[in-house]
């Protein structure tokens, strides 16, 4: 036990992970959670058919059982935050992105729509009523997709009853946060997607929403963000029927929780040495695994700051591996393509607690495991021994081994850029591009001068 006390504001993925790691370091940790349960977006934002509640509760239980203190129903304002700074050695802010982005739509008040976050919280808590009539969801990200699939269940659209659930997005499907499998599942659930549309104004009858007026878009040149510019098509306005409107266009941090004068200065730091940030509050809306990683990193930073030394080091262990290049991976593994995981039948999806994607089962697990590229094995060429015979180039996959004229290096000596050439006369090096290497070992076995070696790298963490 270090005797140090740390407050974690927010019991979502980042806060829970930070608390667990800080407890492992020997600190006294207290989580302050404004809701009546821990989990954050795990319980409020991600639908049960994607992430079952019993799994979440089991994982949270494993963390809290380590001796972490939890204060529920505690909203931290500036006065309470300042008190925490007096009582605790460090404070971690991991409250996520709780403020929904709102696009102004003429003629609509807050009574005429809900946000994706609001809807998903009500849906996951079981407090939402069955929707009647057409539902429009504005957005093209993860929240919009989850909201639409939740609406399909709430409105019983899955079974084909009257009315439609429609996602409306201002760009094209290619720019949405959705893959082909998700599109197929939404199609099964009778969810419509309409693209290249932007909302203009709401149509109100008897103080209730009856439709949304849209304008059609076309895409211009790419902007600095990488996405194409959105331009309106003249005289293309039209109205879609809608009894319910949900705005699911992302969310942002609520910085008002920070005391006056405190600003975020880095990924985990602020201009107050006692206050740290992590997860979505630090980086914006990402995914759960990034928030978990943030929790681990901020805990290590806090421990180092409080104790004065870095107590858990990471280093790479490099050792010679097989002298014949055998990694256990063969060229025919490239022909093993992904297969679809099993999903439950559409008629069983009305119950919002039924997990849809059942994952890989039986032989599928082994089949997918053999697709691993074994990136911990690294093949390298000793340029002192290489005679530029090109035999390795001839036997390996295309673009794996290249003729290089010169390299650019970082200050740490890492290759930053390789200048490839097709001419033998200009080639100063023969180089293995590890990003394209499939670890088949053929280059090592065919090399006449034994210039190629195979090493195994392992990330080692001190306990």
Question: Where are the predicted features?
Answer:
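General beta-strand structural signal in soluble alpha/beta enzymes
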Residues: 33, 72, 93-95, 115, ...
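Surface-exposed acidic, glycine/proline-enriched linker/cap segments
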Residues: 116-134, 138, 217-238, 413-429
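Rossmann-like dinucleotide/flavin-binding elements
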Residues: 8-32, 71-83, 99-101, 118-180, ...
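Feature captures the FAD/FMN-dependent oxidoreductase FAD-binding
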Residues: 4-9, 14, 57-105, 201-213, ...
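Rossmann-like dinucleotide-binding cores of NAD(P)H-dependent redox enzymes
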Residues: 28-31, 35-66, 70-72, 121-123, ...
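Ferredoxin-type iron-sulfur electron-transfer modules and their immediate structural context
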Residues: 1-5, 91-109, 191, 204-209, ...
